[in-house]
Each structure stands twice: as C-alpha cells, then as structure tokens.
Swiss-Prot record:
The gene is xdhA. One of its GO terms (molecular function) is D-xylulose reductase activity. It is an enzyme of class 1 (oxidoreductase). Xylitol dehydrogenase which catalyzes the conversion of xylitol to D-xylulose. Xylose is a major component of hemicelluloses such as xylan. Most fungi utilize D-xylose via three enzymatic reactions, xylose reductase (XR), xylitol dehydrogenase (XDH), and xylulokinase, to form xylulose 5-phosphate, which enters pentose phosphate pathway. It holds the Pfam family ADH_N. It comes from Aspergillus clavatus (strain ATCC 1007 / CBS 513.65 / DSM 816 / NCTC 3887 / NRRL 1 / QM 1276 / 107). This is Probable D-xylulose reductase A.
C-alpha cells in the first residue's frame, strides 16, 4: 500500500481497486454552502458495505470506477462553520449523517429523503467517504452529541440510525414479540431498539454461537440457532421453544440470507409484519404462498430517514440503548487496511478507526 511522502493536510484512506488501498493527502475541503460545516473526523466504524467495496469493487449497480475514500460511520468535532450556520459552533462534538439528499424531489418532500435518487452518500460511488481528516456536511446533517455520549459512541449513531429505521418500519407495539435474524451490529441494534420500543419477546437468530451468546447478554430475551432442517421445521421449533402461539408479531431480517427470509415468513403469525433490512443476493426464492395466505405486511428498509438519526442519539443519551458494548476494537488511522482484513475475517463486532492525529 502506497503512502504520502509529504506532511499530510487531509490524509485520506482511498480505495483504488479491489484490495488496493492507499493513504493519500487530499485538499482540505472548502465550505460549499453558507449552511455547511467542516468536521474534523475523530472516529469511523467499519461497515460491511465498506468491506464489500474493498473486496469486490462494487455493490449491485454501485461500481467504484475512480479512486474513492472509504468510510461513512463517523463522528467528529466541528472545525469550521459557514456564515449561515446557527445550530453549531467550532468545537462542537457531532455524529455525522453521511447521506445528503437533494431536498427537492418528491420522496424528499414527502419526508422519505432516504429514497432520493440524487442522494450524495459517503463512500457510495461516485462520492468520497469520511475516512479522512476533514469532511464537509450541511449543519442539519450533524447531530450535536450530549456530554454523556462519547465520540466513539457517536460513530455508532450511523448503524443505530439504520436499526431505528428498520424497527420503525415494523411499527412495533409494546408487548409484541419480535424475531431478529442476523446478530451482526445492525441486528443487535434492532434487538436493542425493539426492547426500547416495548417488545416483550426479542428472539435473536444466527448461525454463529458466539454472536448468539453476545445477543443474549446484550438485548435479546432469547436466542435460536437454526438446525439444518427445513425453514418450516425451524419456524415450528422456534414457536414452540419461545411460546409464540400462532407465531411472532414481527420479523426483522438483518441478514439478507435466503434461509432466514424463508424461516422468517413461516414463523410469523397471520397478519404479522415482516421487514427486510439486510441485503443479500439480488434475487432469491420467496415463499409467496405463505406470505399471501397469512396476509402479511411486508416492507423493505433502506438506510435512514427523517427523525431516525435524532432518535438514535436520544435513545443512547437516555440510556435506553447501549452502543458502547458493541465496540470491540479501536485502531489508529494508519492501521486501517489491517482492520479491514480483520473485519472481513469476522473478528469482533464493531471496529473503529481513530481519526488522523494532529
């Protein structure tokens, strides 16, 4: 991996090709709008999408054609403010929402800006990410962190925002039963948000015993490790073990795995709600007969929208959701490539990359 030989001003972690990354000094970003701020990035979490771009150079139709700075799960300190900024000042600690919509299209005006076709999302081609010393954002996409939330925790507002959006899509009511497939960071956070929303039974499902053990200590009320049997058989076993009666009220799939989708549809009660939050293959087989005859409500979930980031911050500030326990490693900026390799190998739950030192 190449490194810059000059004193860096805005050192950035750049993906040039599959498994080809380098540290590159780039210009310090300028304020593009009076309402913008420049953030000195302090911590960035490694997301599965970052690793996927590093591993494959593309996610679906998003293809890395030019060198791209990685990273989008970040927190930092405001370093500069535009002339029209009123809600932030230099020195404020913030969580950084990394996708900026056009604000003018129909989805934006309807409050669903996560569906904006002109979304400029960090580390999604052709837009650079946040693994740099400085990053520009509109002030309203920076969320001031209360004193009881650290900058490390602030970096986890991004995956928590994803989990908040997924869980809000499910419209969970107090006392309901929820099954969450996939005990990675987002699935674990979905369990935590479901608990904060009042779910009485939260069953985490995964094929990795270590993840299930963590889920049980973290936010799940029960865990389930699928056997190598049919989806119907696993669903029946889950219902019986957890006294779900006719089935779960809500299923959240945070895995994207086809067997999870099938089991999730079968474990739901008639009239239940299914939310697909995890992305897997572009196309899978789907149990359409079971979905129709049980008249399920089926929803997708993509990133986060209006109010999700703010709620994420509020949930942590109030103590209703704990994100600190998910942080299993913090590395220096210069160790970013090795950290990507370890995340790819499945080490830890959430690894953070510290910002460039002054």
């Amino acid at each position: 991996m190449a490194t810059s030989s000059t004193t860096p001003q805005n050192l950035s972690f750049v993906l040039e090709g599959i498994h080809q990354v380098k540290f590159e000094d780039r210009p310090i970003p300028e304020l593009r709008d009076p309402h913008d701020v420049i953030v000195n990035v302090k911590y960035t979490g490694i997301c599965g999408s970052d690793v996927h771009y590093w591993e494959h150079g593309a996610i679906g139709h998003f293809v890395v054609k030019d060198p791209m700075v990685l990273g989008h799960e970040s927190s930092g300190v405001v370093a500069k403010v535009g002339s029209a900024v009123t809600s932030l000042k230099v020195g404020d600690r913030v969580a950084m929402e990394p996708g900026v919509p056009c604000r003018r299209c129909e989805p934006c005006k309807a409050g669903k800006y996560n569906l904006c076709e002109k979304m400029a999302f960090a580390a999604t081609p052709p837009y650079d990410g946040t693994l740099a010393k400085y990053y520009p954002l509109p002030e309203d996409f920076c969320y001031k962190l209360p004193e009881n939330i650290s900058l490390q925790e602030g970096a986890l507002m991004e995956p928590l925002g994803v989990a908040v959006h997924i869980t809000r899509q499910a419209s969970i009511k107090p006392g309901e039963s929820v099954v969450v497939f996939g005990a990675g960071p987002v699935g674990l956070l979905c369990c935590a948000v479901a608990r904060a929303f009042g779910a009485s039974k939260i069953i985490a499902v995964d094929i990795q015993k270590t993840r299930l053990d963590f889920a049980k200590k973290y936010a799940a009320t029960a865990i389930f490790e699928p056997a190598k049997v049919s989806a119907v058989a696993n669903a029946d076993q889950m219902r019986e073990e957890n006294d779900l009666g006719p089935g779960a009220d809500v299923v959240i799939d945070a895995s994207g795995a086809e067997p999870s989708v099938h089991t999730g549809i079968h474990v739901l009660r008639p009239g239940g709600t299914y939310v697909q939050g995890g992305m897997g293959r572009n196309e899978i087989n789907f149990p359409i007969m079971a979905a129709c005859t049980k008249e399920l409500t089926i929803k997708g979930s993509f990133r986060y929208g209006s109010g999700d980031y703010k709620l994420a911050v509020d949930l942590v500030a109030s103590g209703k959701v704990n994100v600190k326990d998910l942080i299993t490693g913090v590395v220096e900026f210069q160790e970013a490539e090795q950290a990507f390799k370890e995340v790819k190998a499945g080490k830890g739950i959430k690894t953070l990359i510290a910002g460039v030192r002054d």
